[in-house]
Amino acid sequence: MVLFELSELETWMVAYFVILAFILGNVFGSFLNCAAWRIAHNMSFVKGHSICPNCQHELGAMDLIPIVSYVASGGRCRYCKEPISIRYPITEVLFGIISVVMLVKDGVSVLYLRDFVFASCLFCLSLVDLEIYEIPNGTLIVAIIAWVLSLPFINADMNYIVIHVGAAFGFAIAFLVLSLVMDKMLGKDTLGGGDIKLFFVVGLYLGLVAGMFTVILAAIVALVFARGRERIPFGPFISIAAWLMLIFGNPLVQWYLEMIQI
């Protein structure tokens, strides 16, 4: 269900929704950063106030304004004067851009909200995986719930549901088998259980063909970054590839289907 396509709106309305989407992305980028840090340190991201990771001082409202607080404080904690990681403003700006890109693709619609939740989950789990090499189940559960709840509003027929659910289970089973075989052959853990569950969610959102391209793209990028490293988290590469396919994958999927004449 699309409320507004941006192409149908006047220029000032387009600017309004773009700015709104960017601010929404900033706010959620800040929240996801905090949530990821708390999850990685076995803390609840629902209870308690935000704190400085250096001095543990509770942060006030003026410390939590996305981007603005970082710039105003000169990139340092107002209490202990220790430098604040540049990761915070970068992720806030980045997720603001991600939000705008999805708005341009989906318009003001339920699909935008669904994709926003999906991107939020990918973003959060990537930050956690980068820090502790684990993908939190909660992010995957939220993504699955968002997908299910969106179905009545995006004109999803039974064929759509069967294809996407089938792709989800297909990817999960295929990578589970591959992981077991590779673990046996190499004598060590290869693909983590979190990665397998993430592929399930990717199949649910993207379907079979776009999901396959996601696997290929994630593997290529991961191989490039893996040079000289003994271990890398795979979740961020899957997430980046999945988001790129979510936004730009339709032409690639259409080309592939036409090539095999489906």
PLM features: residue spans?
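Short, strongly hydrophobic alpha-helical membrane anchors
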Residues: 1-14, 258-262
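Alpha-helical transmembrane segments of multipass membrane proteins
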Residues: 28-33, 95, 99, 150, ...
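Transmembrane helix-loop-helix
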Residues: 104-114
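Functional transmembrane core segments of multi-pass inner-membrane proteins
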Residues: 21, 112, 117-223, 255, ...
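Interfacial loop-to-transmembrane junctions
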Residues: 192-194, 225-244
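Core segments of transmembrane alpha-helices
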Residues: 91-98, 139-147, 196-198, 234-239
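Membrane-proximal soluble regions of multi-pass membrane proteins
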Residues: 32-87
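Juxtamembrane boundary at the C-terminal end of a transmembrane helix
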Residues: 248-262
